């Protein structure tokens, strides 16, 4: 199963983003397809934080618009929204021991641990920091 990182969601929403068209097509294709795909809950909240932040975008996305974007995604029958499960503490420990992720990278470790716990093996992201987490194949859909 493929999972999406926050940046794909942000690029799909923000038309001025360099990768907007590609991200929008990717997201629309996954949402309308039958193959299971996933987003970890921390990415949902990070999307809201980024697109509605005045310090990031001028003007920022209106909160109601951002929420409606998410509600439309949530209607996709093939989407799996992933959170911490029963094995999360042990998976978190393994991910942190292996990656030595700390500081700002702890957030990425949280996402990686959720995905690994749920058996996700491929993450689509433009964030190269995820390459440090063994057990996740990282694909940048914007690189040729």
Model-inferred region functions:
Residues 33-34, 76-77, 133:
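Structured helix-beta-strand junction loops
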Residues 1, 112-144:
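Acidic, PIN/NYN-like endoribonuclease modules and their adjacent C-terminal/linker elements
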Residues 1-39, 54-68:
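Short, well-structured N-terminal submotif of metal-dependent ribonuclease cores
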Residues 8, 43, 87-88, 110-111, ...:
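Alpha-helix capping/helix-boundary segments
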Residues 36, 78-80, 137:
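Conserved beta-strand segments of alpha/beta enzyme cores
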Residues 60, 78-122:
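Active-site neighborhoods of divalent-metal-dependent phosphate/nucleic-acid chemistry enzymes
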Residues 38-42, 125:
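Short beta-strand segments at enzyme active-site cores
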